[in-house]
Amino acid sequence: MASSLKLGLIALLGATAVNAAPAAEPVLGTSLLTSRASCTFSGSSGAAEAIKSKTSCSTITLSNVEVPAGTTLDLTGLKSGTTVIFEGTTTFGYKEWEGPLVSVSGTSITVQGASGAQLNGDGARWWDGKGTNGGKTKPKFFYAHSLTNSKIENIYIKNSPVQVFSINGAKELTLSGITVDTADGDSNGGHNTDAFDVGSSNGVYITSPIVHNQDDCLAVNSGTNVHFTGAQCTGGHGISIGSVGGRSDNTVDGVTVESCTIKDSDNGVRIKTVYGATGTVQGVTYKDITLSGIAKYGIVIEQDYENGSPTGTPTSGVPITDLTLDNVHGTVASSGVDTYILCASGACSDWSWSGVSITGGQTSKKCKGIPSGASC
């Protein structure tokens, strides 16, 4: 009897042990959670290690990383909720290629610069005065593509070889406290160093950027619900819509540019559409814009661009409607033009201008198709 009880007890304990086996699963779960930890990468191997480990880290800190020549710091496809922090100085090896130097994508992503951090493109190695129009092949800097409900903040970019931020396919993306400093390019052949190029995005909010460059401070080529506020733009070509037309997406709808200063630039406010193309520009507002030291045009709106240059002949395929200019004021050089409007017949309508005062330059005798509510 005792022997039978003993055997029964052993069998019972064994069955209990088997039934208890699933209790080990929470331990595995805990292990999986800890794999999404904070990771720090640095030095010449930092880029490769970060790329390899990017989906295993909840926080990716890049400390004085040296990105090899011809390599993208590829942080695309990050897990939702990942934070990327740049510390110290991030540098990039030299090679003639198209780039980008950095690329980030994902949902609920935060990209931020620590205090004193800098992404230094050392663009003078590529600058030849030609930008993307010839000469050396130059890498674009930062692709912010396919970012959803994300933010990029307190990033300082120094001396980009060519265009800086390419924002494409973004939804609800905020960029705040961004500095784009390519001032050295003024005297060293910097060209086409656009700060922010926006395309095919819905909900882009760029606040308080400080920009010194040699091309557009902002260029919205397509997209909806784009807000550009509190910008300080120096040098370059002004704050632009377009050129619109000739791409797969040719709709600009709902752009607000507000409380910005533009100084020592070729242009102030600029809207340009492509000759012979189709598309739409509507719901654009420029409000509380201050211009100073503008060399060519204080306000320039034209529907005649072809191959990057004006033709003098506007076409109506990309109408410009519901355009508001409110308190846009400032000065243009005596050799420049205060306001220039070149619209095809009936292609510009429903414009509202108030408090617009551009002085110092010449009055254009070539304006055409000026809609009611505007003056040239």
Swiss-Prot record:
**InterPro entries, alphabetically?**
Glyco_hydro_28, Glycosyl_hydrlase_28, PbH1, Pectin_lyas_fold, Pectin_lyase_fold/virulence
What Gene3D superfamilies does the annotation carry? Single-stranded right-handed beta-helix, Pectin lyase-like
Chain positions of PbH1 repeats: 170-208, 223-243, 252-273, 281-303, 315-360
Q: Which GO terms describe its cellular component?
A: extracellular region
- Subcellular location as annotated: Secreted
Q: What class of enzyme is it?
A: hydrolase
Q: Does the keyword Cell wall biogenesis/degradation apply?
A: yes
Q: What is its EC number?
A: 3.2.1.15
What is a GO molecular function of this protein? polygalacturonase activity
Q: Which reactions are catalysed by this chain? A: (1,4-alpha-D-galacturonosyl)n+m + H2O = (1,4-alpha-D-galacturonosyl)n + (1,4-alpha-D-galacturonosyl)m
Q: Where is the signal peptide?
A: 1-20
* Gene Ontology terms describing biological process: cell wall organization; pectin catabolic process
Which Pfam family, an example, fits this chain? Glyco_hydro_28
Task: Please list every transmembrane segment annotated in the UniProt record, as residue ranges.
Answer: none
Query: Is Secreted one of the keywords UniProt gives this record?
Result: yes
Q: Report the SS bond pairs.
A: 39-57, 217-233, 343-348, 367-376
- Cite the entry's keywords alphabetically: Cell wall biogenesis/degradation, Disulfide bond, Glycosidase, Hydrolase, Repeat, Secreted, Signal
The positions flagged as active site in the entry are 215 (proton donor), 237
**Xref: SUPFAM superfamilies:** Pectin lyase-like (SSF51126)
Q: What is its main location?
A: secreted
- Similarity field: Belongs to the glycosyl hydrolase 28 family.
This one is known as: Polygalacturonase
